[in-house]
């Protein structure tokens, strides 16, 4: 594939997309991609609107020099450059994954909803990704490796070089006398991807010269099989999901294990969560779905958790405990609740309760215990039973503001008022409104 072939290949992959945000590290791959786009804009695609983004991770001593290089290149080629600085969580097991997450989150905040994000992964990257998935014991989803096109937050990510080898990109760069930076970490064989690129893939290609192309075909076939399964299982999945995206356990029970796990995977994929391992799926089913009826089981997946309530599975963000929070409140002023739960304020609407006596301190908490009687009920009940009878899921109980006067529970706002808090005719009453930013 010569220079013009590569440019034509990229033009074909663009397929009418005209507003592009190019991820530019300054390395060989993204340099070739950006150069080809600039050439296309100058020759046959004058309506291309290019922007470039470079992410400074702060992980290398050379990071500032890379920024300088990218600025010089973009100035020369007359494309606007945005440099984003991110903080990478170096305490995570994989610094590479942490850097990728931080990079994509920063780019997501920059990209315009009408733009397409272009990244420069190529054929050899695809081969390495496939082998890494194979090493992890992945199924067809993981072995599909990287897609040519995929959703990126509210936009789209396109990889137009995925069929082009590193060798072809190097030849292109040499023909056009391009300069690029070398990431010093790419020479560190302690990283799995580098180990594959430096030691394993060259050995495989020495024996089988077209090994990377064969791997790419296998990845493509796996992706086709997954797409077919998605289409075949979509109707079944929709039948099992409620309006709040919960998944019916009873609907999964009579199914074969293979179909049940396939549906669980696709349900999880609906939330954009990293695909669970087989062991995690087995734990989800046996430890959460099939836990004893009086249990409140949960399983953490990446930054989410799977919970069960009333014979349904729910996938939720991981929430910090608020059990120890005690917020003093002057009800004549709005109160901002923690964790984005909204705001409390007095007004003409909301929960109606008696006003406190002069000696009663007003606080907001997020837990309650013991036995109490709520307005509208004749008998006292354990609060856990009350929650269950009102069909309030455990995770919502833990994030419902509880109004206390002294040590007396007055109301679970938006849910119930206790006998202690009942407004009596002729007495001073308060209306407390909870403006929710969640649920």
Curated annotation (Swiss-Prot):
Q: Which family does it belong to?
A: Belongs to the tRNA(Ile)-lysidine synthase family.
Single GO BP term: tRNA modification
**Alphabetically ordered keywords of this record:** ATP-binding, Cytoplasm, Ligase, Nucleotide-binding, tRNA processing
User: Which HAMAP family does the record match to this protein?
Assistant: tRNA_Ile_lys_synt
Which residues are recorded as binding ATP? Answer: 25-30
Q: Does this UniProt record's set of keywords contain Manganese?
A: no
Where does it localize?
Answer: Cytoplasm
The record lists the catalysed reaction(s) as: cytidine(34) in tRNA(Ile2) + L-lysine + ATP = lysidine(34) in tRNA(Ile2) + AMP + diphosphate + H(+)
Going by the record, the broad EC class of this enzyme is ligase
Q: Which CDD domains match?
A: TilS_N (cd01992)
Q: What is known of its domains?
A: The N-terminal region contains the highly conserved SGGXDS motif, predicted to be a P-loop motif involved in ATP binding.
Q: Which GO terms describe its cellular component?
A: cytoplasm
Q: What SUPFAM superfamilies does UniProt report for this protein, alphabetically?
A: Adenine nucleotide alpha hydrolases-like (SSF52402), MesJ substrate recognition domain-like (SSF82829), PheT/TilS domain (SSF56037)
Main localisation: cytoplasm
Its EC number(s): 6.3.4.19
Q: Kindly provide the name given to this protein in its UniProt entry.
A: tRNA(Ile)-lysidine synthase
- Single GO term (MF): ATP binding
Q: Tell me, what does this protein do in biology?
A: Ligates lysine onto the cytidine present at position 34 of the AUA codon-specific tRNA(Ile) that contains the anticodon CAU, in an ATP-dependent manner. Cytidine is converted to lysidine, thus changing the amino acid specificity of the tRNA from methionine to isoleucine.
């Amino acid at each position: 594939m010569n220079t013009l072939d590569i440019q034509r290949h990229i033009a074909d992959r663009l397929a009418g997309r005209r507003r592009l945000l190019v991820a530019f590290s300054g390395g060989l791959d993204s340099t070739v991609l950006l150069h080809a786009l600039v050439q296309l804009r100058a020759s046959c695609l004058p309506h291309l609107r290019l922007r470039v983004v470079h992410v400074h991770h702060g992980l290398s001593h050379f990071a500032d020099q890379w920024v300088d290089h990218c600025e010089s290149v973009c100035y020369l080629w007359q494309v606007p450059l945005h440099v984003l600085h991110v903080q990478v969580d170096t305490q995570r097991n994989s610094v590479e994954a942490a850097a990728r997450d931080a990079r994509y989150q920063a780019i997501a905040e920059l990209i315009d909803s009408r733009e397409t994000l272009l990244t420069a992964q190529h054929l050899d990257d695809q081969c390495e990704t496939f082998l890494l998935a194979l090493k992890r014991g992945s199924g067809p989803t993981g072995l599909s490796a990287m897609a040519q096109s995929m959703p990126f937050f509210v936009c789209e990510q396109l990889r137009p070089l995925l069929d082009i080898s590193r060798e072809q990109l190097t030849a292109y760069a040499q023909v056009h006398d391009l300069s690029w930076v070398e990431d010093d970490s790419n020479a560190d064989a302690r990283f799995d991807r580098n180990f594959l690129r430096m030691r394993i893939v060259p050995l495989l290609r020495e024996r089988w010269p077209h090994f990377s192309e064969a791997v790419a075909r296998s990845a493509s076939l796996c992706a086709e099989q997954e797409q077919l399964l998605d289409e075949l299982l979509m109707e079944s999945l929709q039948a099992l999901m409620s309006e709040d995206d919960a998944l019916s356990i009873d609907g999964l029970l009579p199914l074969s294990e293979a179909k049940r796990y396939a549906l669980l995977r696709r349900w999880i994929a609906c939330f954009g969560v990293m695909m669970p391992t087989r062991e995690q799926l087995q734990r989800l089913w046996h430890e959460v779905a099939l836990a004893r009826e009086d249990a409140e089981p949960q399983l953490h997946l990446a930054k989410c958790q799977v919970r069960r309530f009333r014979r349904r599975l729910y996938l939720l963000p991981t929430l910090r405990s608020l059990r120890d929070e005690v917020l003093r409140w002057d009800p004549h002023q709005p109160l901002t609740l923690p964790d984005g739960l909204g705001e409390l304020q007095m007004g003409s609407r909301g929960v109606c309760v008696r006003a406190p006596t002069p000696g009663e301190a007003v606080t907001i908490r997020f837990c309650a215990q013991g036995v109490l009687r709520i307005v509208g009920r004749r008998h006292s009940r354990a609060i856990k039973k009350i929650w269950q009878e009102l069909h309030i899921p455990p995770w919502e109980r833990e994030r419902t503001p509880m109004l206390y006067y002294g040590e007396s529970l007055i109301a679970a706002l938006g849910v119930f008022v206790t006998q202690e808090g009942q407004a009596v005719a002729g007495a001073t009453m308060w209306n407390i409104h909870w403006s929710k930013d969640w649920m």
